[in-house]
Amino acid sequence: MKLIARLIIIFLFSITVNAREIGETEITSEDGIEVYQNEKFYLLKKNVKIESDNFTLIADNVKISFDKSLYDITELDANGNVDFNSKEFKIKGNGNFLNFKVKIEKIKVEGEGSQLITEDIEMFSDGFIEVSNLNGDFLLKGMNSKLINENIIIKAENINGNFTDKIDKKEITNLEVNDQDVSYVKNNDTEMYAKKINFNNETSVIELIDNVIIIRNEEKITGDYGTLDTRNNSYKIKS
């Protein structure tokens, strides 16, 4: 049920004039707010800014789902020039569209030039990027998808994997990469090309499938299938 205009005006006045205190959420928008109390969501229009203890969000338009109160945010859907930054969740990003499920810490950004950046991993795509912060799952899908961390660079249409938190950094534990043309992975001093590239941290082996190329120290080797052991830095290729 849409609330009456008077309540909307009072709500907007209270959140734009009063300074935000710890534990509060400050929300501003130029073209007002539409609240649907029964459905438990509200719409913010034009130059929206949301600032809380957990995150800051800027976008053209935002839909907010809530639980017990308007400030008890459970989910955000933001459209247009989206910029998101969370010090608590240690992640920031931008894109044309963003969905953020607050309680399960799952974030998805979409659109050309989308990016998500954590403490140790940078992700880019013209399709979409999705990260589940609690379990470490991530997925990049679309043109110009790329993942970068301290030891590895990955480029492919589809990058699917998982990372875990170590003492001082995030570590990639599983990885599945594929591309209709070719996937690219650079690990330290070795460059690898293949249609499909898989990695399992338990075995420390990178597996390369179809149209395989491995380049190291100006040496180039090709084949149909290859493996690289990251533990002892050795590799094998066969046709």
What kind of feature is each model-predicted range?
Residues 2-10:
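Sec-dependent signal peptide recognition
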Residues 10-18:
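Hydrophobic h-region of N-terminal signal peptides that target proteins for export
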Residues 18-239:
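N-terminal amphipathic/hydrophobic interface segments
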